[in-house]
Amino acid sequence: MAPGEQQLSLVPDDTIQGSLFAPEPSEDKTEESERPKQRRSHPGRRTAPAAQHNEDSSNNDDEGLPRWHHHGLVDPLALTPMLRHYVELKAAHPERVLLYRLGDFFECFFEDALLTSRLLELTLTGKEGGKSIGRVPMAGIPHHAAERYCSELVRRGHAVALCDQLETTAAKGALLKRDITRVLTPGTVLEEGMLAARRNNWLAAVVLDDEQRWGLAVADVSTGELLLHERQGTTELQQQLLQLEAAELLLPGIEAAEWCPDGLGLTQQPRTPFEAASADRALKQRFGVRNLEGLGLADHPLARRAAGGLIAYLDASQPGSTVPLERPQLVFAGDALVLDHQTRRNLELTATQRDGQFQGSLLWAIDRSHTAMGGRALRRWLEAPLLDATAIRGRQEAITELVEQRPLRLSVRRLLRPMADLERLAGRCGAGRASARDLVALADGLERLPLLADLLKSSSAAPLADLQQPRPDLQQLAELLRFQLVDQPPMSLSEGGLIHDGVDEDLDDLRNRLDEQENWLAGVEKRERKASSNPNLRLQFHRSFGYFLAVSRAKATAVPDHWIRRQTLSNEERFVTPELKEREGRILQLKARSHQREYDLFCRLRDQVGEQATAIRDAARAVASLDALAGLAELAATQGYCRPELTDGRCLEIEGGRHPVVEQLLSESAFVPNSVALGHGDKPDLVVLTGPNASGKSCYLRQCGVLQLMAQMGSWIPAERAAIALADRIFTRVGAVDDLASGQSTFMVEMAETANILQHASERSLVLLDEIGRGTATFDGLSIAWAVAEHLASAPPHGLGARSIFATHYHELNALAGSHSNVANFQVVVEEQDAELVFLHKVMPGGADRSYGIEAARLAGVPPSVVQRARQMLERIEGGQPLAC
């Protein structure tokens, strides 16, 4: 954390914070930890940490730190047995925050205590470390709130190792058995509270050879997806990583290189798991195959190595459980429309260019899906539009059917609205992490599949066919879950109340015996009321004291002789009887056996669900596609979209097109539609677009790119009519800023982006350029702009012949239309009314000869004196007069 950066604190519940700290009991009683009585004031406020608290600092100055601020400073043999074990585990996981279960809390010590107390705003306290050690730093969190706190640590990029208790009762004179049961890292979390619901949480691993050929494995452990890439060139690798925005990237034995995007969470790994033999062995074991030909990986050695190393990392982070992964799927370069990072950023696909916000992005504007899995599916479609015309038409057919059949669309969306995230629920079940409430939510979702199948039985669109077939195995699973689990199970899995009566004979027998004991307790209460002549006597239970008889202080002096005083409170006295204490042991033993039996039954049921994780995920992905399609249909039906016609060749013809984001953001005026026609018949390949500043040229460029992209998603688009041929790539260069990190000026950034376009565009590409050459001297800029435009318009081999729109203030470029038959001039028109400039935002044929820059400056609020002086200088320039006088 940089100095001055604010740290985000979690706001603890008052009940949690109040019970989090208590005095340390004597050593001979429990292993519980000492907790101070005071609470930190304002625990939920954001505070700026002091400079010395910079967690990323390499400063070794220990001034102001506790004596034992690092576990490596102590002699393990001088520590208490519990802390000695903690230090042994910490030495094995030095880069991870170690949370060590002690009773109802997870504790951390030494440097981890200092870190968590600062990041999570926990009170830093201490624990006795040994006679020669004294007190060592300690901080703790309640075990039932661990997910909340761990989520914050993971969000900040820290890995967390959880050391849990492996037994409930220790042998006499021994510590409870504890060990690492889970490692939480940004790329391996499964818990719902640690994941963004509507986007994948990618874990990636890269293997690079000496010839810059690379293999990339990408897994989402929460959904089971495993994607493999193998290609050439680190530039393409960088683009792939920028697109993925992986939560964590595994690098085997190499440091971060220039191709590694800034801000990516990197985890260094040993080379061995990524070597060919180890990786192949891991893949065969995970997927139960004797050779890798069956997985289609025989000819992709680097992808295999990356996948094998990733699987080894997952196995190490999930001891005792196996995260269910689907068989690997190879992804090839020509599978989807290519969108480089700059194009994604310029078109604002998932975040706005100015401030990185979701609201205002294209995904924000078009996402009408109801489920988390539908939202993830739509995001994937947006990030990887199709190149297969058949697949695109299939999605179009489904949307058309749902648009035209409004009752069907509304019924489908009503069924989908409450559906849980079946894809991730299946993953948690397979990994043994699902709760009882997760299984109930899963049952509810599976019960909706037959209802969806019935609604879609007459549908003819291919994407809807996957849900038309009955799934008897999943229907039986839903029935099993409903039969065994109560409708509203508790959060805890260890305190009973999960399983219906009639499911298990042994459990029913234990419950019947407990009912008998409850009847006996009711009889005791009735009998003791009579014996004490106190009708207000209550028989109660406390976790620490067991069963007791409670009477008011006023009645406490007249109790029977066989009562034994146990506790005195301000308003009541508590007593026990020999008979009650003798029976208490039997009751508690029965409860423990009953709870354990329920837990065992639940785990068995969860394992049964996990065995069908693949089938559940298949159904979930079909539901996700339906949800995404139904959402796009709702958008099309309510926003006046049209179905674009897919054509062969290079046609891009859109009548009355609108920008889907801008038209939703406009509140006081209607969006002005505009048309475009490129790449076929007598239509140009290159449009030179001129017009005033702030008139809408950049919006028009983005609109054309967005509508091409939406069409290749299979979506309808905001237009009156459209005929669109498939593009292999979309390139945009709209605006540029200095790249301070690499020392590049605005002009150099602009030229680098332009060079990338000219090197990779083809006749089938769509190229959208704004203001090429503006960052240098006027004549240099004009010359560059002319040459670039001419190269785009010229057919191969002399140029690219790409469909292009070139927005510029160099009005000299209008002359290109006179020398190139496939170039046309268009302008964004304005009107001058009473010396005022009125922007019409309408694109019309013909080239502009003025940019109205001074009028735009006036509208932007430039002082009148400066505007007037600018007009004077313009007159001098246009009149050929010297500027200085």
UniProtKB/Swiss-Prot annotation:
Family label: Belongs to the DNA mismatch repair MutS family.
Entry's Gene Ontology BP terms: mismatch repair
Compositional bias (Basic and acidic residues): 26-36
Keywords from the UniProt entry: ATP-binding, DNA damage, DNA repair, DNA-binding, Nucleotide-binding
GO molecular function, one term: ATP binding
The keyword ATP-binding is annotated on this UniProt entry: yes
Keyword Membrane among UniProt keywords: no
Residues holding ATP: 691-698
One Gene Ontology CC term in the entry: cytosol
Gene3D superfamilies the record matches: 1.10.1420.10, DNA repair protein MutS, domain I (3.40.1170.10), MutS, connector domain (3.30.420.110), P-loop containing nucleotide triphosphate hydrolases (3.40.50.300)
UniProt name for this protein: DNA mismatch repair protein MutS
Function statement: This protein is involved in the repair of mismatches in DNA. It is possible that it carries out the mismatch recognition step. This protein has a weak ATPase activity.
Annotated stretches, region: Disordered: 1-67
Native species: Synechococcus sp. (strain RCC307)
